[in-house]
From Swiss-Prot:
Any one Pfam family match given in the protein's UniProt record, by short name: MutL_C
Gene3D superfamilies per record: 3.30.230.10, Histidine kinase-like ATPase, C-terminal domain, MutL, C-terminal domain, dimerisation subdomain, MutL, C-terminal domain, regulatory subdomain
GO MF, any single term: ATP hydrolysis activity
Alphabetized UniProt keyword annotations: DNA damage, DNA repair
Record-linked PROSITE patterns: DNA_MISMATCH_REPAIR_1
HAMAP family the record matches: DNA_mis_repair
Statement: the UniProt record of this protein carries the keyword DNA damage: yes
A Gene Ontology cellular-component term: mismatch repair complex
Protein name: DNA mismatch repair protein MutL
Membrane-spanning segments: none
InterPro entries: DNA_mismatch_repair_CS, DNA_mismatch_repair_MutL, DNA_mismatch_S5_2-like, HATPase_C_sf, MutL/Mlh/PMS, MutL/Mlh/Pms-like, MutL_C, MutL_C_dimsub
Function: This protein is involved in the repair of mismatches in DNA. It is required for dam-dependent methyl-directed DNA mismatch repair. May act as a 'molecular matchmaker', a protein that promotes the formation of a stable complex between two or more DNA-binding proteins in an ATP-dependent manner without itself being part of a final effector complex.
Length: 595
């Protein structure tokens, strides 16, 4: 087969596939151009999740006719001049590929007017062909329009997800960009409806509240770390405000949203290791300002990956600051300032080898002192009261079945405010009260749903709550399922909702937290079928049952156990954990050597 030289049109389409994989990439590149043009106000409009229209308007510097004509040429950029500049990148974009790639697969237009000039120019191009430039009389700044994205690459269209999914990806990206650039105003529209609007502010906390919600912003603590080569401004949830998923974890490097390097992600989780449950996650936003020569962003065209020259140094600083803040009770804001670097010492470290840390190690401050605990000789204790040789007695548990029980099960009491002790037919049973209550509620709820007899409790005072724009979109897409299951939710303003009714069987509980937890569960599996989502909602709602630590009366315990054995699957909770543990009289007597 002979070797052929590809046409420029084919080359452009192939290159476009690397830079513009989906509408999200086009939106991201255009918004970054606006930021690099020092815009203080950016408006983004999309239709059909960006496939029909993407329009980005800004009040930045604009372009003259010469720069406008160069802007759509591949590898034409105002950000760098040569390879050396890659080591000192201050802008978000620098490759000179974005506009050429977008123009190759869309009907593309730029309208721009440079600051200080009386008039502007408009450039239009269809699939990198028929380039036209004409005068334009608009305001200072730039408006970029992308219509019929991928009209000439049907294979690319075929691999796009649903409008809901593609729109969600765009909104997620714009949320990150708005969080990173809190000093710029953003207005985001989808199908001519406002998705979110964030006014220009000098407060990161205000922007976090605008995007991620006031309730979340109130839970955040703050530490500031000033170092000669890097500054960190960290907003993080405390020990009592852990989250069900990793949704609220952001890293911004020089105002660029990036993925967490594995090393820094490990640092965050290690900092929280002893502060939150293993199945929970922290919310954390890290804003870093670092010398551009200390990072490498030229790793992937998406510019989501970044390498730090001294990850170990940053790890050390961040870990100690976060760990100390979590251990400390009070003082929501902590500031750590480092002395200027000793240049001679720093140079000596560089000469001695690359393993020398670039960041000076810091002394961990003493939060409080404890008296040393007395040391016990556990070995001698083990010799005198070891139960290892009896461990196998309790390991052999008989299979639990409803047939093992009769109606005369006797509740003995509750221990540790978590377990209910009962006896039946000469055997002893330990019930996990939370797992048992979850199973009872789950099957009652499921039964009422299938028979369409869900009893509704109207709320005297509706519960209002806010969500981030992307989570709002997810709730709107699934709101009918909630309503079918008796959880009545209404839109109540931009990214605000209210709950007006809920299933009576759930009892007197806060529905706001339950709904937020359910949405987090759905987000983890966005592509689940409707039946799976219904089941997920019911399972999540039932988590609000009797908890471990709740004091249960004798009558409540008796009713719970009786209800449990009316269930089809009484011996596991809806999430698969066991509800009961059986110890036979025979096992007990063997342990005490009565047999």
């Amino acid at each position: 087969m002979p070797i052929n030289i590809l046409s420029q049109e084919t080359v452009n389409k192939i290159a476009a596939g690397e830079v513009v994989e989906r509408p999200l990439n086009a939106v991201k590149e255009l918004v970054e151009n606006s930021l690099d043009a020092f815009a203080s106000s950016i408006t983004v409009e999309i239709e059909e999740a960006g496939k029909k229209l993407i329009r980005v308007s800004d009040n930045g510097f604009g372009m003259d006719k010469k720069d406008l004509e160069l802007s759509i040429l591949r590898h034409a950029t105002s950000k760098i001049d040569d390879f050396k500049d890659l080591m000192h990148i201050h802008s978000l974009g620098f490759r000179g590929e974005a506009l050429a790639s977008i123009a190759a697969v869309s009907n593309f237009a730029i309208k721009t007017r440079k600051k200080g000039e009386n008039s502007g120019w408009k450039l239009s191009v269809a699939g990198a062909k028929d380039i036209k430039v004409m005068p334009w009389s608009g305001a200072e700044g730039t408006i970029t329009e992308v219509k019929s994205l991928f009209f000439n690459t049907p294979a690319r269209q075929k691999f796009l997800k649903s409008d809901s999914t593609e729109r969600s990806r765009i909104i997620n990206s714009l949320e990150e960009t708005a969080l990173a650039n809190y000093d710029i105003s953003f207005k985001i529209f989808s199908e001519n409806k406002t998705v979110f609007s964030a006014a220009q502010t000098d407060s990161k906390t205000e922007r976090i509240a605008d995007i991620l919600g006031k309730d979340f912003a109130k839970t955040l603590k703050n530490i500031k770390i000033d170092h000669p080569k890097i500054s960190l401004d960290v907003y993080f949830t405390g020990r009592d405000n852990s989250l069900p998923n990793k949704k609220y974890q952001y890293l911004f490097v020089n105002s660029r949203p990036v993925n967490y390097p594995k090393r820094l992600m490990h640092c965050v989780y290690q900092s929280y290791k002893e502060s939150i449950p293993r199945d929970k996650y922290p919310g954390i936003l890290i804003y870093t300002d670092v010398d551009p020569s200390e990072i490498d962003v030229n790793i992937h065209p998406a510019k989501r990956e970044v390498k730090f020259a001294d990850e170990n140094g940053i790890y050390d600083i961040l870990f100690k600051a976060l760990r100390n803040a979590l251990m400390s009770q009070g003082h929501p804001e902590i500031k750590i300032t480092y002395p200027p670097l000793d240049k001679e010492k720093s140079a000596k470290q560089e000469v001695e080898g690359s393993t020398a840390p670039r960041f000076p190690k810091i002394q961990q401050p003493v939060i409080y002192a404890r008296e040393p605990k007395p040391k016990y000789n556990y070995a001698s204790l083990k010799q005198t009261c070891s139960i290892d040789k009896y461990a196998d007695v309790f390991a052999k548990q008989e299979e639990l079945t409803p047939e093992n029980f009769d109606s005369n099960i006797k509740v003995i009491g509750q221990v540790f405010d978590t377990y209910i002790i009962a006896s039946n037919k000469g055997d002893l049973y330990i019930f996990d009260q939370h797992a048992a209550a979850e199973r009872v509620r789950y099957e009652f709820y499921l039964s009422q749903m299938k028979s369409q007899t869900i009893k509704i409790q109207q709320m005297l005072m509706p519960e209002n709550f806010d969500l981030s724009p992307s989570i709002s979109e997810l709730l709107k897409a699934n709101i009918n399922i909630f309503n079918e299951l008796g959880i009545s939710i209404e839109e109540f303003g931009q990214n605000s909702f209210r709950i007006t009714a809920y299933p009576a069987l759930l009892g007197n509980i806060s529905m706001e937290q339950i709904v937020k937890t359910i949405i987090s569960d759905i987000e983890d599996d966005k592509h689940a079928e409707i039946e799976q989502k219904r089941d997920k909602i019911i399972r999540s709602a039932c988590r609000a049952s009797i908890k471990a630590g709740d004091n249960v009366s004798f009558i409540e315990a008796k009713k719970l156990i009786n209800d449990l054995f009316k269930c089809k699957q009484p011996f596991t909770c809806p999430h698969g954990r066991p509800t009961a543990y059986k110890i036979s009289l025979n096992e007990i007597e063997k342990f005490f050597k009565r047999k």
